[in-house]
Amino acid sequence: MAFQQTLKNKVAFSGIGLHSGKEITLTLRPADAGNGIVFHRIDTTPPVSIEARTENVVSTRLSTTIGKNGAAVSTIEHLMAALFSCGIDNAHVDINGPEVPIMDGSAAPFVEGIRNAGSKSLSKSRKYLVVKKPVTIRDGDKRITVLPSRYYRISFDMHFNHPVINRQFRTMKFDRESFADDFSPARTFGFLAEIEALMAHGLALGASLENAVGIDDNGIVNPEGLRFTDEFVRHKILDSIGDFALAGVHLVGHVKACKSGHELNHKFITELLSRSDCWSLMELTPPENKTASFPISLPEMAWLEAC
């Protein structure tokens, strides 16, 4: 689509917070063109609005947290990935607590709800950040590189010193249907010993086998097992899409990540946005005889080769 989109109708989600263990409700509402994704902490006095942008990230410990004026919202990455994958550029997110509900540990419930709410085109062009030169950021043996590409593609190489995970690699060319079917159901995961330690420090109070894949020394603890044989790396790609969505534009490039997490994802997007010599910001304007919803093959943009 050449034009920005928003929700056609409101949609609400309720569930427990992964870390607080408290019941939380959030409501997505339509927003005007150029608004972006804005969270509203409606439980604070006065309410605080926080734009879902890279510059508002205040923590990347365990999840991605945005904050402003003393208020914060954590664990936003699954919702951000769902909004991005459904083509929603603008939305108000009313939330009555400090974190997005974890739901089943994946982005699938959000994708389903957003799809049911529907979307509509707005009168403003969507912006695309088209990578022209490679950009790399490293932290020890962790690394993220983005290369020029006609597509938005993510390749992820993950390593864990555990026989259940070991090394997993997957690459995906971003496509809404592929994300919905093959990546959005992938759940967050954790090692039981680490989860118990977090609980002892007042974190992960809402974690359970209902919203995460549990791993112990012997293997997968969940009775139902995994949703995909490589569910772990699929979830890492899901998280990355959500974190990268905080750039506020649609990325056109091939991201290659190795052992990265929320912290490096944030550093990467911050670095990329600062390197304006390595990309071009483009808008698509449809021909005058086309409607606002005319189809265009994006991010598979053959015209990029001429840029």
Swiss-Prot record:
Q: Which domain of life is it from?
A: Bacteria
| Listed GO CC annotations | membrane
According to the UniProt entry, its GO molecular function terms are:
metal ion binding; UDP-3-O-acyl-N-acetylglucosamine deacetylase activity
Query: In which residues is Zn(2+) bound?
Result: 78, 235, 239
Q: Which UniProt keywords apply?
A: Hydrolase, Lipid A biosynthesis, Lipid biosynthesis, Lipid metabolism, Metal-binding, Zinc
- Annotated EC: 3.5.1.108
Q: Where is the active site?
A: 262 (proton donor)
Under InterPro entries, the record lists: Ribosomal_Su5_D2-typ_SF (IPR020568), UDP-acyl_GlcNac_deAcase (IPR004463), UDP-acyl_GlcNac_deAcase_C (IPR011334), UDP-acyl_N-AcGlcN_deAcase_N (IPR015870)
What catalytic activity is recorded?
Answer: a UDP-3-O-[(3R)-3-hydroxyacyl]-N-acetyl-alpha-D-glucosamine + H2O = a UDP-3-O-[(3R)-3-hydroxyacyl]-alpha-D-glucosamine + acetate
What's an example Gene Ontology biological process for this entry? lipid A biosynthetic process
- Cofactor(s) required for function per UniProt: Zn(2+)
Can the keyword Zinc be found in this entry's annotation? yes
Q: Read off the Gene3D superfamilies from this record.
A: lpxc deacetylase, domain 1 (3.30.230.20), lpxc deacetylase, domain 2 (3.30.1700.10)
Q: In which pathway does it act?
A: Glycolipid biosynthesis; lipid IV(A) biosynthesis; lipid IV(A) from (3R)-3-hydroxytetradecanoyl-[acyl-carrier-protein] and UDP-N-acetyl-alpha-D-glucosamine: step 2/6
Presence of the UniProt keyword Hydrolase in the record: yes
Similarity-based family: Belongs to the LpxC family.
NCBIfam families linked to this entry: lpxC
The role this protein plays is: Catalyzes the hydrolysis of UDP-3-O-myristoyl-N-acetylglucosamine to form UDP-3-O-myristoylglucosamine and acetate, the committed step in lipid A biosynthesis.
- Name the chain's protein: UDP-3-O-acyl-N-acetylglucosamine deacetylase
